[in-house]
């Protein structure tokens, strides 16, 4: 028997020393962090470990629908492609959405699961980033300073389950790539310091920026500061070597960003063409104690502040760092100064803008707080790697106790904090004291390893549970139900009625998510994205569609005429969280080409108004600028009829409404044809619209109840004294026989006591009247959104 065969037959003994070898530290840290997060979600009963949905905020409204759409693209069941999305907004570009929301490499796991389980791979995106980021941080800490592999793995778990992850990052899978980008770029910067692997480092930077450029920019800035501190402290290197390393890092970062330029430039151009976000206002620096309270694990404050905690092991070592005498004073000062400067930069507006791409973000203004958590982990590792003495550890423990006492009563300090700080903190302190006194004893090291591992694992799990539970109690963080039985039934129904490309099947009515067309299929008007084109949003609004967030979330058109214009042959209607009804209608051609048609060509009355000098686009009495007129212009034919109104009675009727109260009645037919422009307060007839043959075939829509259309009264005269109506053509026309303003009792502003509109005999003549189109002379905008008014604006 040869020597090789004898070696092959020898049994392999797996020992503690083998398992704690440096090569096993990164996967050990990844498994520990992922296990702690899963345990926390199990305690909460959150999906996929319970029935509680985790689709909160944008996770349910954007990321789950976008991942479902990616599944459709991967399996060839979508009506569009990577360049264009025919499902949302009646057709919008998609490439920028893909490069922003779906470039996380873990997002492609969605193709391995059935469509109805698409929420599971979205959870795996978060879980995978936690594991990979923790493993890479373990490697990066080893490059900062040599030391025990399993100890730095435990500290890396604090980074992977830090407050930013469980509070902010878990709800935005695209941000979770920042957890991976920071140690990736840190490793590349370390190679620059040692003048190695420029090409590999460039690729790491490119991967970080391609995955998510927003958080990668934060990580790049943070690691540039870390590299600057390391170069400043590397006094053993000649100055020319340090300058060369700095130049090497700059060229590496620039080249890596250029590699990701196709993704960055596409999203930048799409952002410029999109609806602007609502202006966010930074409300100033939070109280200092509220910021410091965020260092204590287990709580989530109601005061907006950076989420910072990294677990009790990391916090205790950060507190002990200034007292570790084995570390030179200048090193302690440099690292503490860096952390303090970064913390201050988060609450000072100029530097806050620098961290967030020169714009105050909507929502949390502290999205870069994972950067400070990483710096705290680095400081804790430097303290632990220099083997702090018992007295130094005790000083750190006193500092933590003082911090907890000062922050008592702050919103970020909850019941979980008082479980973790004294309970987990005592175990961690005892383990570190034993390690400091009996480091040479193997049995002591095994006991300390087990105690610290359990403390870190259970503490991280409990912190994730408590913070997520506290966050979900906030009203606008309430979980949504995305892919339940009702949603799957709606998807099957849409697939059965699909008639694309002959006509559209509108999934409406925004029942399950803000991106129902992506979630359920079909071709609707709902679309919620940072890249919603400005022209698309305005066009849909001018046709009567509603929007949220100042146009960053559009809704499907609900009027039959608007649906006909968009070629919708099947649609779903129903109240929120109520039964969903399916409607059908004959659809106009999906695409129609016809010569341009002027607004004055639609009816004789508008031509006459234009001849008299009245702006037919803005005057509501003519209707040229109303939703109804725009629909007629697109159809190229008359659809609505404005009834003739005449005054009856003296306007002194009761308050019960009707002609007696308002002094109005309808002359001519007793019902309105269509649901055209009419005065408020008139009876609302059923809608019956017949579209003429040119340019579409005849379309008969069923009688449907039609809500009050948006047809606002003109504003009163800006002079404020003459009780006249502003005509929009350079003056006001007071009513004949109008008395002084004080003589009015129950009349509406701008009307006579009889409730009539002003006459047309005399002008006010006041020089203070602003010209048409000015802020004071402009009539109120037409409201839309289900015809009854704009939906509430979200944040």
Model-derived regions, located:
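Start-transfer (signal-anchor) and selected internal transmembrane alpha helices
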Residues: 1-46, 248, 437
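Transmembrane signal-anchor helices characteristic of membrane glycosylation enzymes that use polyprenol
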Residues: 23-59, 252-265, 343
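Membrane-interfacial loop-to-transmembrane alpha-helix junctions, especially the N-terminal start
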Residues: 26-29, 147-154, 190-201, 249, ...
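Membrane-interface coil-to-helix junctions
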Residues: 37-137, 157-179, 286-293, 347-351
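Periplasmic/ER-lumenal interhelical loops and adjacent helix-loop junctions
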Residues: 61-62, 245-248, 252-334, 341-342, ...
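Membrane-embedded helix bundles of polyisoprenyl
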Residues: 130-144, 150-234, 245-267, 403-404
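Contiguous transmembrane helix-bundle modules in multi-pass membrane proteins
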Residues: 337, 341, 359, 365-483
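Soluble catalytic regions of membrane-associated enzymes that act on cell-envelope
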Residues: 455-691, 695, 702, 712, ...
């Amino acid at each position: 028997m040869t020597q090789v065969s004898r070696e092959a037959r020898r049994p392999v003994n797996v020992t503690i020393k083998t398992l704690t070898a440096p090569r096993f530290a990164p996967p050990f840290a990844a498994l520990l962090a992922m296990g702690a997060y899963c345990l926390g979600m199990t305690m909460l009963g959150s999906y996929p470990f319970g029935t509680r949905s985790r689709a909160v905020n944008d996770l349910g409204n954007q990321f789950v629908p976008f991942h479902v759409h990616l599944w459709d693209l991967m399996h060839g069941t979508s009506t569009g492609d990577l360049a264009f999305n025919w499902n949302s907004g009646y057709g919008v570009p998609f490439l920028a959405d893909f490069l922003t929301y779906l470039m996380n490499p873990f997002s492609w796991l969605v193709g391995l699961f059935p469509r109805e389980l698409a929420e599971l791979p979205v959870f795996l995106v978060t879980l995978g980033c936690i594991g990979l980021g923790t493993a890479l941080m373990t490697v990066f800490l080893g490059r900062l300073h040599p030391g025990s592999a399993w100890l730095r793995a435990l500290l890396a778990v604090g980074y992977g389950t830090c407050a930013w992850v469980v509070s902010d990052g878990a709800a935005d899978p695209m941000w979770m790539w920042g957890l991976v980008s920071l140690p990736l770029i840190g490793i590349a910067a370390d190679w620059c310091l040692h003048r190695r692997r420029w090409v590999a480092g460039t690729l790491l930077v490119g991967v970080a920026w391609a995955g998510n450029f927003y958080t990668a920019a934060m990580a790049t800035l943070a690691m540039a500061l870390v590299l600057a501190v390391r170069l400043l402290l590397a006094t053993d290197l000649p100055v020319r070597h340090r300058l060369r390393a700095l130049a090497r890092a700059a060229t590496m970062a620039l080249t890596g960003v250029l590699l990701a330029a196709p993704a960055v430039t596409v999203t930048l151009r799409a952002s410029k063409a999109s609806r602007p976000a609502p202006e966010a206002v930074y409300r100033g620096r939070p109280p200092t104690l509220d910021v410091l309270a965020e260092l204590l694990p287990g709580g989530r404050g109601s005061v907006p502040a950076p989420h910072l905690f990294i677990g009790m092991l990391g916090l205790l070592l950060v507190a002990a760092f200034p007292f570790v005498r084995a570390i030179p004073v200048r090193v302690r000062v440099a690292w503490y100064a860096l952390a303090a400067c970064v913390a201050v930069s988060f609450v000072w507006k100029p530097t806050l803008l620098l961290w967030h791409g020169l714009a105050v973000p909507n929502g949390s203004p502290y999205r870069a707080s994972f950067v400070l958590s990483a710096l705290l982990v680095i400081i804790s590792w430097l303290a632990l790697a220099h083997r702090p003495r018992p007295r130094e550890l005790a000083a750190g423990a006193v500092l933590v106790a003082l911090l907890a006492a000062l922050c008592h009563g702050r919103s970020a300090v909850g019941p979980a904090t008082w479980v973790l700080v004294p309970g987990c903190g005592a175990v961690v302190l005892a383990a570190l004291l034993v390690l400091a006194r009996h480091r040479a004893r193997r049995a002591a090291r095994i006991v300390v390893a087990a105690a610290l591992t359990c403390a870190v694992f259970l503490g991280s799990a409990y912190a994730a549970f408590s913070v997520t539970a506290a966050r979900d109690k906030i009203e606008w963080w309430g979980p949504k139900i995305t892919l339940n039985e009702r949603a799957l039934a709606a998807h099957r129904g849409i697939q059965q009625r699909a008639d694309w490309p002959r006509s559209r099947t509108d999934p409406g009515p925004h029942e399950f998510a803000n991106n129902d067309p992506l979630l359920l299929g079909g071709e609707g008007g709902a679309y919620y994205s940072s890249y919603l084109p400005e022209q698309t949003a305005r066009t849909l609004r001018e046709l009567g569609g509603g929007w949220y967030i100042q146009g960053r979330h559009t809704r499907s058109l609900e009027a039959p005429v608007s649906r006909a214009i968009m070629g919708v042959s099947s649609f779903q209607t129903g109240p929120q969280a109520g039964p969903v009804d399916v409607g059908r209608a004959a659809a106009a051609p999906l695409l129609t080409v016809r010569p341009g048609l002027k607004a004055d060509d639609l009816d004789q009355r508008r031509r006459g108004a234009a001849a008299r000098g009245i702006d037919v686009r803005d005057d509501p009495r003519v209707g040229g600028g109303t939703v109804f007129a725009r629909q007629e212009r697109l159809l190229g034919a008359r659809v609505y009829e404005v009834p003739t109104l005449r005054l009856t009675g003296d306007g002194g009727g009761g308050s019960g409404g009707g002609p007696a109260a308002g002094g109005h009645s309808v002359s001519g037919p007793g019902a309105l044809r269509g649901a055209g422009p009419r005065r408020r307060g008139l009876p609302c007839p059923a809608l019956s619209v017949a579209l003429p043959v040119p340019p579409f075939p005849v379309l008969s829509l069923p009688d449907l109840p039609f809500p009050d259309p948006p047809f606002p009264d003109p504003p009163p005269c800006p002079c404020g004294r003459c009780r006249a109506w502003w005509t929009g053509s350079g003056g006001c026309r007071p009513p004949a026989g109008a008395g002084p303003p004080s003589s009015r009792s129950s009349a509406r502003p701008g009307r006579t006591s009889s409730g009539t509109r002003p006459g047309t005999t005399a002008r006010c003549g006041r020089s203070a009247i602003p010209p048409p189109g000015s802020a004071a002379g402009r009539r109120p905008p037409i409201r839309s959104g289900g015809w009854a008014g704009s939906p509430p604006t979200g944040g």
